[in-house]
Amino acid sequence: MCGIWALFGSDDCLSVQCLSAMKIAHRGPDAFRFENVNGYTNCCFGFHRLAVVDPLFGMQPIRVKKYPYLWLCYNGEIYNHKKMQQHFEFEYQTKVDGEIILHLYDKGGIEQTICMLDGVFAFVLLDTATKKVFLGRDTYGVRPLFKAMTEDGFLAVCSEAKGLVTLKHSTTPFLKVEPFLPGHYEVLDLKPNGKVASVEMVKYHHCRDEPLHALYDNVEKLFPGFEIETVKNNLRILFNNAVKKRLMTDRRIGCLLSGGLDSSLVAATLLKQLKEARVQYPLQTFAIGMEDSPDLLAARKVADHIGSEHYEVLFNSEEGIQALDEVIFSLETYDITTVRASVGMYLISKYIRKNTDSVVIFSGEGSDELTQGYIYFHKAPSPEKAEEESERLLRELYLFDVLRADRTTAAHGLELRVPFLDHRFSSYYLSLPPEMRIPKNGIEKHLLRETFEDSNLIPKEILWRPKEAFSDGITSVKNSWFKILQEYVEHQVDDAMMANAAQKFPFNTPKTKEGYYYRQVFERHYPGRADWLSHYWMPKWINATDPSARTLTHYKSAVKA
């Protein structure tokens, strides 16, 4: 996890502009570099480094002697870089995984390069020989990327929007900043004056398509067919491999553990893989919650079962409420469910950074979207409609759960790794018949649970534990986190303010006092940037007025049972 920043065609003093780059310093606390592009006085790169791989030679922009015309600034991890290096017999100058991007690009161009990358990434690649600039982002947008571009060709790129909003440009006082779409790359012409012109924007990968790099994977051969035992065996193979490849780091590994199905499977598989790799330190797992939190109890059971070095972080409602301003600033969104769920993740990340030496943190993000884990999937009118909704959620991850996971950890200089969003695992899961993936017998994620039923990987009661949203599970059923927040904002937002909400906030007008409060905080930090969120996250098919799972009939029935 790092922070990248780049300008092309700036008409303001670069020494002034680069102050904006310092707004993402939290993403890379280990080192910083600011470098002008040779021959272009108005083009530059900025890089904040979190040293995870090759601490000695990992600074950016990456430049190697063989390709003096290439400049690369990227944030991410390329898990198959050694496999690609060996297969194509590339001569490396460093041990940095991102160097593979330069070699692949020189060999086959940008399309082949980006399709061959197995990992998570956001990059800016400059080729001064062909006068081209390339931007690219991974399939699910696990690594963030924002851009601002004016009609006269000024381009600014950054890992977080906050690094762009204060930039100056003579022709455009208010720069339009927008997220770069996941699963896309863009080609731009670089003009002699340092400005750029967009040539094409290409969607290079659909989430259900098997990635091109699968041809070179080390995964053992999968069995053909959709018989249930065959499918379960293939899923175990792919999930184990998804975790194993993510062990690539020179820093200590930890794992978030809520006690839910997803984080428990990740933690248990991770500990198993660390033992097989003969890592010399125990796995640290981390859970957060208030008193009487069901997550804390469940996480404790899992930690005892797998034998991890477990940490429990307690917080109270006052601490959670006090963190809201920092959380919304870090997130760059005002989405209600995202803000709710981010408070606990922000506080536990803060604890990890301050009290432990774990830096690379595993988590279960992406599973609910992939495996139809949200409770409202019980109400899907058909398997096909459930499949459509699952793919929509995956396409929008970069606006919600992936955004939350990245910003709350990056705010404290941690790197998050999410095995459920592995290309091979997710594309195989999406290739299964729709009727295999829907909830069964009143239980969501039935196929995933069934896959690991006989493995003794995690306790049976956890394997079949009903879905509990992270923002709900950190508090007791009697006093849910969303209720605590709603009680607080009741005294911060009055009825007169709500009556004027549509006039004050015509776009994405908040419908509740909680939404109004978050929007106020957001506008204070990012005035006029409400369009970063296209819509609020909300369950389908059930006429929900609140995103919390605890407001749904299915959840209430499960609790009573």
UniProtKB/Swiss-Prot annotation:
UniProt-annotated binding residues for ATP: 256, 288, 363-364
Amino-acid biosynthesis listed as a keyword: yes
GO molecular function annotations of the record: asparagine synthase (glutamine-hydrolyzing) activity; ATP binding
The Glutamine amidotransferase type-2 domain, residue ranges: 2-191
Residues recorded as bearing N6-acetyllysine in the entry: 385
Residues with site note (Important for beta-aspartyl-AMP intermediate formation): 365
EC top class named in words: ligase
Phosphothreonine sites (modified residues): 545
Active site: 2 (for gatase activity)
Domain Asparagine synthetase residues, every copy: 213-536
E.C. number: 6.3.5.4
Gene Ontology BP annotations: L-asparagine biosynthetic process
SUPFAM superfamilies: Adenine nucleotide alpha hydrolases-like (SSF52402), N-terminal nucleophile aminohydrolases (Ntn hydrolases) (SSF56235)
Gene3D superfamilies reported in the protein's UniProt record: Glutamine Phosphoribosylpyrophosphate, subunit 1, domain 1 (3.60.20.10), HUPs (3.40.50.620)
Pfam family, one: Asn_synthase
Binding residues for L-glutamine: 49-53, 75-77, 97
Keyword Ligase recorded: yes
UniProt keyword list: Acetylation, Amino-acid biosynthesis, Asparagine biosynthesis, ATP-binding, Glutamine amidotransferase, Ligase, Nucleotide-binding, Phosphoprotein
GO cellular component terms, A-Z: cytosol
CDD domains per UniProt: Asn_synthase_B_C (cd01991), AsnB (cd00712)
Modified residues (Phosphoserine): 557
Pathway the protein contributes to: Amino-acid biosynthesis; L-asparagine biosynthesis; L-asparagine from L-aspartate (L-Gln route): step 1/1
Reaction(s) catalysed (UniProt annotation): L-aspartate + L-glutamine + ATP + H2O = L-asparagine + L-glutamate + AMP + diphosphate + H(+)
Protein name: Asparagine synthetase [glutamine-hydrolyzing]
Gene: ASNS
